[in-house]
Amino acid sequence: MNQKQLEQMKTSKGFIAALDQSGGSTPKALAAYGIPEDSYNNEDEMFDLVHEMRTRIITSKAFDSDSIIGAILFEQTMDREIEGMYTGDYLAEKKGIVPFLKVDKGLAEETNGVQLMKPIDNLDETLRRANERNIFGTKMRSVIKQANPKAIKEVVDQQFDIGKKIIAAGLVPIIEPEVDIHSPEKEKCEDLLKAEIINHLNQLSEDENVMLKLTIPTKKNLYKELIDHPRVVRVVALSGGYSTDVANEKLKENNGLIASFSRALSQDLNADQSDEDFNLALEKAVKSIYDASV
């Protein structure tokens, strides 16, 4: 593990850019960027276009380590190049930004008010390649919709079981049990989730460290205990469907919680913008998310 990057993740000011839309969510991301589905004929063309979009974001002067500590990539992006370098190397070496890899394979069907992760095939192989590509950590997401204690325990058990394999491979896992912002029991879900996470954190050894990616809680500073826990490198927040402005306002109410937004970062970007307009729009988004994170 890169100790300099670990220190950067623990202490640097800023946020984590989530650039990890996968196959399922790519058409939506491209459409929001002004590239409709009829612009490409197959998946290969679609992934080429989304890599062009990500390259434009990552190479922009607005995308820098003064504001952005880390970036989460989709597996395809990790295997592609920017200006002749693998994306993770470009981020780390040219930009001073810590690269992460999304490793989950999507969500299982909802049962008992939660969605566990689908089985992650070839995890060992993916982690081996991530190490080769100088990736620092990983991210994987599950979703909680109802305050079912047994089901929430299952979600957290699954996250930490896989998280330990990731730690054993020398990477830092971002554990993301998202609470649905539309859940009528959101606050109760968050209380149950916090207790379950603390239980797992307390069982980790001194050299087992994780990051957490959580929905911004209804109760202000609910996650302070997690932020201060010695086994936690950093706690980041997902925007969860809130608009940028709403997410930023909610984030400001929670000390020590920083952003890891995707939609909020790219919502005002468009394929047809001139480089000047594109950079200005990205700079504005970066500044607003940074300000809410510090």
Curated annotation (Swiss-Prot):
Q: Establish whether keyword Cell membrane is in the entry.
A: no
The superkingdom of the source organism is: Bacteria
Which residues carry out catalysis? 176, 213
What Gene3D superfamilies does the annotation carry? Aldolase class I
Q: Tell me the route in metabolism or biology where this protein functions.
A: Carbohydrate degradation; glycolysis; D-glyceraldehyde 3-phosphate and glycerone phosphate from D-glucose: step 4/4
Q: Which GO molecular function entries does the Swiss-Prot or TrEMBL record give?
A: fructose-bisphosphate aldolase activity
Keyword entries, A-Z = Glycolysis, Lyase, Schiff base
Similarity section: Belongs to the class I fructose-bisphosphate aldolase family.
Under the heading PANTHER family, the entry gives: FRUCTOSE-BISPHOSPHATE ALDOLASE (PTHR11627)
| Protein name, as recorded | Fructose-bisphosphate aldolase class 1
Tell me the organism: Oceanobacillus iheyensis (strain DSM 14371 / CIP 107618 / JCM 11309 / KCTC 3954 / HTE831)
